[in-house]
Amino acid sequence: LDDRRYMDIPGYDRMYLDDATRFIATMNHGYAGTRELNEALVSRFMVIEMPKQSEETLTKILKKDFPTADVEKLTQFIGVFLDLQEKAENGEISTKALDLRGLIAALKTIRCGLSPVKAMQMGIVNKCFDAFEKDIVQDVVNVRIPEEWTSEDIF
């Protein structure tokens, strides 16, 4: 994986790489099971720092996936994500609840008829296993997603 352009695969053979070969790896730094990379490994790669999600990006993604959603209400779901993102950046919560896939899954279940509050509990809140953290995340959801909203209000 360096300038020699080959890999030795134990028990197999030496594999020569085309000049156009690239490897892309991802790492969720700070997640359980990850640790600091050693200097020798880091020196072999370039690092792409991914920016935090913006309201504009989230709106584009969610409008594409949910074109029939009420725009004002969709903005509240985006607000939940952005509020949680800020809390995670400030160290108030872990990044477990900061889950775009969970938000999308919650919106899909709302579209199928589940209440927005229950869907957010399943898709976002219940990703936290610490009771204190779960309460914080639930409070963020409660501020933006009223209990009386139904799936028909969103879609």
Question: What positions do the PLM features span?
Answer:
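C-terminal regulatory/interaction module of P-loop NTP-utilizing enzymes
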Residues: 1-155
